[in-house]
Amino acid sequence: MSSNSFAYNEQSGGGEATELGQEATSTISPSGAFGLFSSDMKKNEDLKQMLESNKDSAKLDAMKRIVGMIAKGKNASELFPAVVKNVASKNIEIKKLVYVYLVRYAEEQQDLALLSISTFQRALKDPNQLIRASALRVLSSIRVPIIVPIMMLAIKEASADLSPYVRKNAAHAIQKLYSLDPEQKEMLIEIIEKLLKDKSTLVAGSVVMAFEEVCPDRIDLIHKNYRKLCNLLVDVEEWGQVVIIHMLTRYARTQFVSPWRQGDVLEDNEKDFYDSDEEQKEKADKRKRPYAMDPDHRLLIRNTKPLLQSRNAAVVMAVAQLYWHIAPKSEAGIISKSLVRLLRSSREVQYIVLQNIATMSIQRKGMFEPYLKSFYVRSTDATMIKILKLEILTNLANEANISTLLREFQTYVKSQDKQFAAATIQTIGRCATSITEVSDTCLNGLVCLLSNRDEIVVAESVVVIKKLLQMQPMQHGEIIKHMAKLLDSITVPVARASILWLIGENCERVPKIAPDVLRKTAKSFTSEDDLVKLQILNLGAKLYLTNSKQTKLLTQYILNLGKYDQNYDIRDRTRFIRQLIVPNEKSGALSKYAKKIFLAQKPAPLLESPFKDRDHFQLGTLSHTLNTKATGYLELSNWPEVAPDPSVRNVEVIELAKEWTPAGKAKKENPDKKFYSESEEEEDSSESSSDSESESGSESGEDEEDDRSGDSAEDSGESGSEPEAGKGRAATRSRARGRGDSKDVDKEKENSKTSESSSGESSSIEESSSDSESESESESESESRKVTKEKEKKTKQERNPLTKDVSLLDLDDFNLVSTPVALPTPALSPSLIADLEGLNLSATSSVISVSTPVFVPGKTHVLLHRMSGKGLAAHYFFPRQPCIFGDKMVSVQITLNNTTDQKIENIHVGGKKLPMGMQMHVFNPIESLEPAGSITVSMGIDFCDSTQTASFQLCTKDDCFSVNIQPPVGELLLPVAMSEKDFKKEQGMLSGMNETSTTIIAAPQNFASSVILQKIVNVANVGVVPSGQDNIHRFAAKTVHSGSLMLVTVELKEGSTAQLIINTEKTVIGSVLLRELKPVLSQG
């Protein structure tokens, strides 16, 4: 029978028959199990044969069936070898489906996927955008560290692709590469910065998601793209909108002042009885001055408002949380209607939305009161939905609607869902505590529930009544008597314990009932729950103190039972009570106060909403749902007291247009800008902005814009006129920007203050934009801001020629050192210009120069052991000398030894495996090395200011050996000579985020000046800075690659402690150096 089925399946159309056969087999008796397995196996064999067929139609049919299997959740991983063979198919449809399959299984079958990696690389150049994007997706799905450089190169190329779909996939690949190798963060940030400038709505959401994953703290990357993201938001795909809105919410909380400020308008009742005319005038001015919202803040709120109508619940929830966290309270009410609309969705969506509404309704009841009936419970609701609706109804309850809600709650108590009924009773108790007018009504209703047939309802009622009676201890003695009668019929431990606690607390008010209750419970003590036993012991102790004649023997009997109980908590409580209430020779002073201890007035319980403390989590996040901080959660920062400079969000439109001017003319145009009229500038800016909306415009200007990022506020003609010289001064520019950021901002503020018309215009823009809602006014506002920015730039550029001459004179007069550190070029940094304007030619100039090493350690490192190198041994050390092969390279000396009795020929460096950006200058090949001979050669390696390993092959005539050189962080520095004054000045500029410090504890003899000097220079190649204080030692250096200053301070404290402080722009290197210096200084 089985042979017939095999033969039948081999015929054409056997695939469909097999699928039908499978479905039929599943309904047959277990005896047909073999048929099921054989048909499964045969079906896969059939698919493999179709994939190996010469006909494209068969392959296409097989791939469609395989993708269909994946879509149904079936495992198709065993077909990977057969599928991957078709990755180079010329049929575009087959290739698409193959890539869909590979994206799913490449991570599981990494070894097989690596065999086709060359095909994927070729596919990255395919004319079809879908193939290019799919190849990138497959490549990024192969999670093997060895292909990280290939992935990085592919992402770089794809980020500049003409197709926005490919660029979108490049943004997705960034996240995968970062999770595979976090050390690539800096290079990935550069790509993210480039993609953030992309004007395609297809790319925006994906690149913001990559930004959130890789560098969410780099808010500076968002400044220039903020307005573009706000304007593109409506057209971005739905899930991209969610990510962008959440990111912009965090951004707004750091860049704008709070719109919730109280006291901006004076109240009438604050006015004094007698006021002078001036005081009345001042108060009237304050009363007229409302909160002026930043135009960019208003832009975000206005552009997200239409998204409240989105069909996607996640988008609506994202906009709702944005309004809740950053919009004025008077405007946040519009989100309530949209959130109520979402309650018609699935129960999962309802659950999340109701949780967020529950949090909102605690603080702002008025938002959801008009929609009270929307939160009434339906019989079809799930239990979790019912309980959340109860929570919201409780939050919205007030004197006006409580009567309606109580009638609703009476119906809920009768529900067959016992968990929901118990929650309703808890709700009634909360309403009774929050609204005193109905507390008696609620209490009477709960007492009526004590006669309910359902034991769970009675038990929950007892617990709630106990809490309510605790708030009014002097009343309701009859209720306590009634509850004592119910003790025989109630079996729920929590309810029995509550009744016993109530009787114990009020034992003096019910002197006849309490001893009888103790007698009954003493009989059943051994069979009671542990919670009830504890309350029986407490009741016995209280009665022993208040009515010992009647209850003394009974209490001793209960204490003896508790002494031998199985639960150690009961035994422990018994010993505690016996020592406290039964005085004996060993009793301490506490026994005198036993009555005060047991019968003290207990504070009333506080019935609060479980959502009260959730508002510190951002709404709509997983952390808010779980009420605990989830992995990857980004906290919302507090509003700043003073808004940061809004000019950082201004886009330099004129600068973008100038990139297309010839290189030789760019320098001449800069001083002539003052001859252009304002109207012409305004026209130019509007034209260039409209041109930049096209797709080609966004692509063509990106590379140049990246090279010049950060230079737009400086001399714009520098990079255009001297491209070659600009490359040579790259380190100088980055150094100037790093140290002058804060001064640049201050300088821009001063320039804006010098022009009254400019400041007046910007203030009028703020007022009009905060009052206006129309799109046309927002456009004119943005143009006005651009014009204002251009006026500020003109003011600076008019001053540039004079300052340039002065600074050139100064530098010519004082350029006395042959090897200066890369200092900021005068024409680039406004902060340096401001410093040089008041400089006197007779003043002493501060010059920071590279000095000779203070100490060169003789420590060598093994490069190649003689056993591994077949007799060839190699050691390397760092001579701390300037490298002759390049200014950015670290000099490395390698000593080669021949430990064999034969000559070793043709020693050279073979293949190199260097991280991205790293460069190596190898030594010349050595023709031969005699037996027992030794030779020392020099190499230069540019480590790019990192401690990454430089891997290469050391080869001889017959063999190649893989070797590694990993530099200590102290060898990536060059010593610097500078004065104490210059040191303090540079240290002041490198404070805050650029400063790391730690405390060192060591013996006093280890803090001698000579010891500290020897330990520091042994670890790091730094120069000694003269210090006028005996307890402070200063050292200075610069990084070899970028020339960034590294300032080290050791400040001795009282006792045997000291503080180690490192200031540098290179915070990673600074923290590594700190970790290496700390143990060295601590040890004896």
Curated annotation (Swiss-Prot):
Residues 718-729, 754-767 have a biased composition (Low complexity). InterPro entries: AP3_beta, AP3B1/2_C, AP3B1_Ser, AP3B_C, AP_beta, ARM-like, ARM-type_fold, B-adaptin_app_sub_C. It is a peripheral membrane protein. GO terms for cellular component: AP-3 adaptor complex; axon cytoplasm; clathrin adaptor complex; clathrin-coated vesicle membrane; Golgi apparatus. Residues 666-677, 738-753, 782-800 have a biased composition (Basic and acidic residues). The keyword Transport applies. Pfam families: Adaptin_N, AP3B1_C, AP3B1_C_2, SEEEED. The modification Phosphoserine is found at residues 276, 609, 742. Keywords: Cytoplasmic vesicle, Golgi apparatus, Membrane, Phosphoprotein, Protein transport, Transport. SUPFAM superfamilies: ARM repeat. Transmembrane segments: none annotated. Residues 1-26, 663-800 are annotated as: Disordered. Signal peptide: none annotated. Gene3D superfamilies: Leucine-rich Repeat Variant (1.25.10.10). Adaptor protein complex 3 (AP-3) is a heterotetramer composed of two large adaptins (delta-type subunit AP3D1 and beta-type subunit AP3B1 or AP3B2), a medium adaptin (mu-type subunit AP3M1 or AP3M2) and a small adaptin (sigma-type subunit APS1 or AP3S2). AP-3 associates with the BLOC-1 complex. Interacts with KIF3A; interaction is direct; interaction is impaired by pyrophosphorylation of AP3B1. Subunit of non-clathrin- and clathrin-associated adaptor protein complex 3 (AP-3) that plays a role in protein sorting in the late-Golgi/trans-Golgi network (TGN) and/or endosomes. The AP complexes mediate both the recruitment of clathrin to membranes and the recognition of sorting signals within the cytosolic tails of transmembrane cargo molecules. AP-3 appears to be involved in the sorting of a subset of transmembrane proteins targeted to lysosomes and lysosome-related organelles. Belongs to the adaptor complexes large subunit family. This is AP-3 complex subunit beta-1.
